[in-house]
Each structure stands twice: as structure tokens, then as C-alpha cells.
Amino acid sequence: KRDFKLCRYTVFAEDNSFSYFTFREYLSYVFSAYRKERPDLSDLIRGFHFEEYTDILLKDLSTGNRKKAFLITAFALKPQLLFLDEPVNGLDFQSTEYLYQQISRYKEHGTILFSSHILESITLTSDRVFVLEHGKVRQTFERGQISAADIREALHYENDM
């Protein structure tokens, strides 16, 4: 059971935990808990435009910057299984693009399971999509079959515009 905890990490849609830690303090805590050496994070910090926020309490960060702190931690940890709940919520355009790049690269390290209501994030990054309804898998799409139109159809999406 303990081994499974060390093989996964979750980035929640909204996370107010560790609010009295700075990002640097949070990193120290997490890498110690996961028994890992902290790698050089400069590329991730730059990629998410987070340079000026590393010494600010997590509670004082905007929703998007708090999300970036947890995403940077997740990608630096490189767990075998990474859960991302609504990963683009709160992110600016550039950080969203960088997130998509990181998700695509991550496939070399492990598996990402993410939930999203943003079709672009699904169609650009997914190898497999499960459309859920009332907690049950309604339809599955494999790589090459994933399109916004098919997902909309599976969701009975109607565009009233």
C-alpha cells in the first residue's frame, strides 16, 4: 500500500492544502515524503512562467499560479501514475500550451489519467478517452479516433448557438 502512494501524485482542480508553505517549502516536503532527490526545476518553472512566485505562500497565489505550483511538482516527481483533475483550469494561454507539451512528453515516464471539460485538452493530448455518464463508461475512443465531434456526440452535446 505504501509503495502505491509513492508511485502516484494528484493535482486537484482546486487545492488549498499546504497553504502556509511557500512553493520551495512544499517542494522540500513532497520530495522528502516521496524519498526522491529534487531535480533541477528551472525548465519547468520557466515553462510555466513561475519564476517570481517560488517564495510566496501558496495561499497568497492566484488559482492559476497555485495550479502551476502543483503541476511543476507533479512533472518534477515523475510518478508512474499522475492524476490531473481539470488541469487547464486557471492557466493562462502560454502555460496551457506548455502543459500540453509536458503531458505529451510525460508518456515516456508514466501514465496520466486526467479529467477535463475542455475538448481541446482532450483531443490534443489523449491516447485514449473514456466518456463517463453517471460514473459509468459510456464510450471509449482510442488514438486516431479521438475527435471533438465524436466526443460531443457521445455526450449528446447540442450546440444551441
Describe each model-derived feature in a short phrase.
Residues 28, 38-54:
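Conserved ABC ATPase "signature" region
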Residues 71:
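Hydrophobic anchor residue at the start of the ABC signature
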Residues 82-86:
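Catalytic Walker B motif of ABC-type/P-loop ATPase nucleotide-binding domains
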